[in-house]
């Protein structure tokens, strides 16, 4: 079930979170045993350090440019680009500039 989002309206996901100086901001839209969906904003230079997920993680950049390091390989993604980070593989996210992304994890 979706939460923290209006239903039956047209919207832009990137407008669900604002930038905050020196922070990573997140808003969870779905969280259950099978699926997690979260919208993030990263201020320039902010990061989520290396970690692994218990499910396959798909990120789509909604605005700006982010750097994703997956098992040592670097990917620079811009608005509209998507990357799947496999389950149990170390990955990290870094704000090359202010950017927003949607993260969907399937367990």
Outline where the language-model segments fall.
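Ligand-binding loop in jelly-roll beta-barrel domains
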Residues: 87-107
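Short acidic-glycine-tyrosine-enriched beta hairpin
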Residues: 72-87
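A cytosolic small-molecule/anion-sensing beta-strand core signal
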Residues: 62-63, 78-79, 97
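A short, compositionally biased micro-patch
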Residues: 30-32, 43, 53, 61, ...
């Amino acid at each position: 079930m979706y939460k923290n989002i209006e239903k039956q309206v047209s919207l832009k996901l990137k407008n669900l979170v604002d930038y905050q100086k020196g922070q990573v901001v997140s808003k969870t839209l779905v969280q259950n045993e099978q699926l997690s969906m979260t919208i993030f904003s990263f201020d320039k230079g902010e990061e989520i350090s290396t970690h692994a997920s218990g499910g396959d993680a798909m990120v789509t950049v909604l605005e700006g440019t982010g750097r994703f390091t997956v098992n040592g390989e670097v990917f620079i993604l811009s608005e509209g680009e998507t990357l799947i980070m496999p389950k149990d593989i170390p990955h990290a996210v870094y704000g090359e500039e202010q950017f927003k992304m949607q993260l969907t994890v399937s367990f």
